């Protein structure tokens, strides 16, 4: 189940994270212990995750048990108690543990800081993690849940169930979910900015690699096709084991570089993440920046054709993966302003030409860059040194 209750919609900093960690605690009909025991007895797995736009509540189970888990998900959304003692004894400590774990994960920390710097911590720039410096009350969590947990804010997605079966479950189990209004967020405003922080491991030792993120405002989800192709064209990974890959970023020596595009409802971030020893990051960042500039000048039709094929594979994987309910792209298309099919999305990618990719790269470079530097910051570059 996807709920339109990501961090961009939260009424107070951290309440979206708190609701995520409240998932599968006591409801009006079931205690937290009963929920866990029944899931174990049925061989099921329950999980919750959070993005900037959505909260995901996922149940994985054996075929034949769908009625039980559909009832449970509906109860978690529609009849949650948000008990004070569970908040104080379980949720608050888990919030601190999540934040501490994220602080030790350079990728999680870097992406969160990048959005915060780019959007000044507002809307989509709101952190996915509650901060100890901004304490949350259980009353604030209840108030946000009352706004978010209603039928207008949820989408039910399944993998392995027929459409008719899913409709039947929705019409029987989810009638208990209260009616309400869909949450609305203020339009996103990109500012651009920088974040730099020394980063060590949990024991205070230097990490083997420093991390540098550079990004520009990208495109909204509805207009993301050219940038999705540009992301695939720049690449950074490999599709074949023991091969360095053919993309420009995969050719950078002594560093790992990867392009990314995080497309949201009304904005997006397109950028490159570099992981390398401190002394190698600056050169790798310059090479990556040159690759983006080269794409803005011109790209070959052959490269674009290859990138389109890669982008289409990634999109299909998002739509049809085994844990489809946990994919942002599916939830966004169901809960966004206009739903779209996989076929129409693939057609959009197929229509992208070389000129479209170059134009998209040119538009990026006209904007203000954002950057995040983690590690030995004295040796790490600034975005304005690269563009």
What residue ranges belong to the model's regions?
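An N-terminal structural lobe/cap that precedes and organizes the functional/catalytic core
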Residues: 1-10, 29-32
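Hydrophobic (often cysteine-bearing) scaffold residues that line and stabilize catalytic clefts
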Residues: 11-15, 69, 226
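Cytochrome P450
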Residues: 5-12, 103-107
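Active-site SXXK
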Residues: 14-25
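A short, flexible beta-alpha/helix-coil linker loop
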Residues: 6, 20-21, 55, 236
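Charge-rich, well-structured scaffold segments of protease-associated domains
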Residues: 28, 32-189, 212, 218, ...
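His/Glu-based metal-binding/catalytic segments typifying zinc-dependent metallopeptidases
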Residues: 2-7, 146, 153, 179-251, ...
């Amino acid at each position: 189940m996807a709920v339109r209750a990501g961090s961009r919609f939260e009424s107070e900093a951290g309440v979206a994270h708190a609701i995520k960690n409240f998932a599968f605690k006591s409801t009006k009909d079931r205690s937290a212990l009963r929920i866990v025991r029944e899931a174990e007895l049925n061989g099921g797995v329950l999980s919750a995750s959070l993005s900037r736009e959505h909260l995901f509540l996922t149940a994985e189970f054996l075929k034949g048990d769908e009625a039980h888990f559909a009832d449970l998900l509906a109860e978690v959304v529609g009849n949650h108690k948000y008990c004070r003692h569970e908040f104080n004894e379980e949720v608050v400590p888990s919030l601190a543990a999540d934040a501490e774990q994220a602080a030790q994960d350079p990728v999680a920390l870097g992406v969160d800081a990048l959005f915060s710097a780019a959007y000044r911590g507002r809307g989509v720039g709101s952190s996915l993690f509650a901060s100890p410096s901004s304490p949350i009350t259980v009353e604030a969590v209840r108030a946000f849940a009352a706004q978010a947990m209603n039928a207008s804010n949820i989408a039910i997605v399944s993998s392995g169930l027929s459409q008719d079966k899913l409709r039947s479950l929705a019409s029987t189990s989810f009638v208990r979910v209260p009616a309400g209004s869909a949450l609305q967020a203020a339009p996103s405003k990109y500012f651009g900015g920088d974040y730099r922080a020394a980063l060590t491991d949990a024991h205070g030792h230097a990490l083997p690699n420093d991390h540098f993120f550079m990004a520009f405002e990208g495109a909204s989800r509805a207009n993301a096709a050219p940038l999705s192709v540009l992301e695939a064209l720049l690449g950074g990974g490999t599709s074949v084991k023991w091969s360095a890959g053919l993309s420009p970023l995969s050719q950078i020596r002594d560093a790992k570089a990867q392009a990314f595009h995080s497309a949201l409802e009304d904005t997006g971030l397109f950028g490159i993440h570099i992981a390398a020893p401190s002394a190698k990051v600056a050169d790798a960042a310059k090479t990556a920046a040159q690759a983006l500039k080269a794409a803005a000048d011109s790209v070959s039709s052959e490269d674009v054709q290859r990138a389109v094929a890669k982008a289409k594979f990634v999109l299909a994987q998002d739509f049809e993966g085994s844990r489809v309910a946990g994919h942002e792209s599916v939830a966004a298309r169901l809960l966004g302003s206009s739903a779209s099919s996989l076929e129409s999305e693939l057609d959009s990618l197929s229509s992208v030409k070389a000129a479209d990719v170059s134009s998209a790269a040119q538009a990026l470079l006209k904007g203000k860059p954002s950057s995040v530097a983690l590690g030995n910051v004295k040796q790490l570059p600034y975005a304005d040194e690269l563009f």
